[in-house]
Amino acid sequence: NFLGSNLRTTIGMGPQEGRVLEEGRAYPDNFGKWNHIVTVWDNTLSEGQLKMYVNGELFFSKTNDVKNDAGVLQNYMPNTRNQNMWAFQEPTDNSRCMTGFIKKFRMWSTAKSADEVKTLMNSDVTGTESGLVCAWDFTSVAEDVTNIPDKTGKHAAKIVGNYKWFKAGN
C-alpha cells in the first residue's frame, strides 16, 4: 500500500539505500480478474520516467524527481553489486507483500513501447529473445521452490513466504 494505493511499483535510484522512485494508484475496476501488468523504466528522457501498463493501456507515468542531499537528480542504479532482487515483497518488512497470483514474470534490458507491451501481452517467450534478461512461467508446480530456473537459463528464483500453486486454466 503506497499512499493509499494498492497497485504500485518501486525502483532504486542512486547508490544510497532508501532513494526510490515510487508511484501507486487505486487498483483498476476489474479487481479480482487476471490482469497483465507491465512496469517500464524509460530513460529516453534525461530524468527518466516510470510507467505502468495494465492490460496494454498506460495506467500511470511518473517522471523521476528523486534527488540526493545535494539536490542532484538521481538516476536508476543497475545492480552492479549482484545483490538479490526483491519482487512483490518489502525486503525489510515481510508483512508488506503482494496478495495475488503471478502467472508469468519477464524482465527486459530495454524499455518497451506501448505497442510492444500490447504485443507481448498475448505472446510467449522462448528465453532467447534479444534483450530478455529473465523469464519465469509459474504455470505448473515447481520441483524445488528454492531454485526455480528461468527460461534464459541464467537465473533462479526462490519463493519466500506463504504461497500456493494453481493449476493452469484456473
Describe each PLM feature range.
Residues D42, N55, K103-K104, D150:
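Acidic active-site catalytic centers that drive phospho-/nucleotidyl reactions
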Residues T9-T10, R106-M107, C134-D137:
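Structural recognition of the beta-strand scaffold that forms the well-ordered cores
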Residues N43-S46, E57, P91-T92, M107-D115, ...:
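Acidic glycine-/aspartate-rich tracts in secreted/extracellular proteins
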Residues N75-R106, K112-S123, N170:
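Extracellular glycan-interaction patches encoded by glycine-rich segments
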Residues W34, I102, L132-V133:
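Core-facing hydrophobic residues within beta-strands of well-ordered domains
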Residues Y76, K118-N170:
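Extracytoplasmic low-complexity segments
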Residues N1-G71, T92, Y163-N170:
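Extracellular glycan-interaction surfaces
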Residues N30, L50, P78, N94, ...:
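Extracytoplasmic/secreted proteins and extracellular or luminal domains
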